Amino acid sequence: MIKDTTFGNKDGFEKFGKSFQEKLCKLIMFDRPFADQMEEVLDVSFFENKALQELTKLVFRHRTEYSVHPSEETLETLVRTEISELPESVQATIRNFVAKAIGNQVVADSDYIKNQALDFCKKQKLQ
């Protein structure tokens, strides 16, 4: 189940930085087994950026509704059709991020990012 806190979370991914958070979102988008693990422990408010929060929720919502991870094509369609209620700046950020991510799915340091993110989320969940 996706957790979403309205007021954000001081104890989020801020300390890891923007690049880490973008790579983490990219891994959730394209690495189904990793997304399975993260869906159990991730509070999307851990992301500093509203666009990354909304994109992650979009992926998880699709997985919940259809019991399958979205393909690249489905993800592009979801971005075109499911984010219209968001502010235009957030929509533009999501569209740009997804286009760049699909163009280059390689994530440097993916094992490190996966381990750090899972460890962090599990520790937060225990608090």
Pin down the residues of each PLM region.
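Noncatalytic partner-interaction/assembly domains of nucleic-acid and motor enzyme complexes
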Residues: 1-120
